[in-house]
Amino acid sequence: MATKPKVRTLTNSSADVLNAIRNSASVNYRNYVPVVTPDADSIREIGAIIMDMPALQNEFLSALVNRIGKVIITSKSYSNPWAMFKKGFLDFGETVEEVFVAMAKPFQYDPAVAEKELFKREIPDVQSAFHVMNFQKFYKTTTEEQDLRLAFLSEDGVYNLVSKITEQLYTAMENDEFQVMKYMLARNLSRGQISVQTINTSNIDDATVAMRKASNDLLFMSNEYNLAGVTTHTLRDDQYIIINTAFDATQSVKNLARAFNMSEAELLGHTVLVDGFGKLDVKRLGELFEGDPNYYEYSKDELEALNEIPAILVDRDYFVIYDKLQQFRDLENVQGLYWNHYLHVWKLFSVSPFANAIAFIPGTPTVTGVTVSPGEATVSAGQVLTLTANVATTNFAPQSVTWSSDNPLVTVSAAGVVKVDPTASGTANIKATSKFDTTKSGTCVITVQ
């Protein structure tokens, strides 16, 4: 079960911060450091006491970053523009299992059949997707002793110090989270794993009609708008439109509200802005995914194509994002008279194969060809072989295929895994047919030996 931390507010008064630290400090700290009054002289007096004793410095700075800084980080973390897509903190484990149960099958009423099938089991069609923790990073910043000394010279100096420390770390974390979310969308778009619909961005009325139709379509049960191909729907209140700033500037709130059959106030709560689906910080992403063999760096042309996408309509549950760990640590370097502060961040980034999503594309999506790799293979009876379908597309057309075999003893799964029966012989043509354009297909010829 995931939980979202409560947003807590913190006054920017140094006196309040100092007293909050004192309230949870050790007995030794409280014996030396009195309660602070909200005036500059009192704060300077406390500063002199703390700066005179290294042990008090360490306890003060540790509490400042770990306790007070955590309040600031937590409150800001759940105020970012894409916060509605985050699930919260993952309380247990590092893996999330997402389960989808298909609709029950209908049966014809027949008392005669009932006599024979009363105790027959009907196993439900259950599909699962596993999402694993895949983001473990830390961020680091340094506080010099002089920074600590200066914090006690003004009424808001202590608060400014903790803000200075945490803002660097938080900004990095928030920016990276946003970049990864955009990268996930880009990867699913370029792989053809999001349903697409052509939209005329040069005509606002036409665009509004197309978006309204898409929103209405999601209200009905369908298997066309999610990666797993399960039959599901998305309620209006669970629909969110991610819209780039350029397209948003051409659309009035009234038009969009009409498109999604919402009041203008309701629409604002379901509209998420993005600077551009191709506005990826390639250098930063390269650092984040360094050493990851699955990371793909987009070319300039690919990023420009992504930036042409005006909007994507997603189910509230499309993104599967959990925080697992968000922890501060600090360490004093007595030789250098400074403290290093570390923010460790563990997250789970994924998307749901069962949640609906529709991308609005300014061009016409097409499938130009399908090839199967390998194109030919010799397989012994009783063995298996995994085939790969490569689907060439334009304008982010879906790349999913349907596998089929012309030999009943040589079967192929939906994932392209070929199984050769021990009694099979001869050849089998394994075909991969594009679901988006059934006129496009590729074939592998299997020879059984």
Language-model features, listed with the residues they occupy:
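Long, contiguous amphipathic alpha-helices that act as assembly "spine/axial" helices in icosahedral shell
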Residues: D125-Q197, L337-L343
